[in-house]
Amino acid sequence: MIRKEFLVSGRVQGVGFRFFCKYQASLLSLTGYAENLDDGQVLIEVQGDESSIRKFKTKILNGNGFSRVISIDEKDLTVDTREKRFSTY
């Protein structure tokens, strides 16, 4: 199990992007959260097996049809074993 942080830039606020992330995470049995930042970016922390996180990243890069992702900055994080679901803030 691994945990990643994705800082997503582009048209990602006000277009259902966080809820799209939550849906994709649930399909892949991932936990974590997606949160709007004041600068217009979305911060995502996601946790699960490496191949599912790779699939998740591909899905969010392609977006939901309303969003437009310009870039995703990625960072490795420490696994949170207490986390049980994917949330949006």
From Swiss-Prot:
Acylphosphatase-like domain sequence ranges: 3-89
EC nos: 3.6.1.7
Chain segments annotated as transmembrane: none
Record PROSITE patterns: ACYLPHOSPHATASE_1, ACYLPHOSPHATASE_3
Active site: 18, 36
UniProt GO molecular function: acylphosphatase activity
Keywords of this entry: Hydrolase
Catalytic activity: an acyl phosphate + H2O = a carboxylate + phosphate + H(+)
InterPro entries xrefs: Acylphosphatase, Acylphosphatase-like_dom, Acylphosphatase-like_dom_sf, Acylphosphatase_CS
Keyword Hydrolase applies: yes
Protein family per UniProt: Belongs to the acylphosphatase family.
Record's protein name: Acylphosphatase
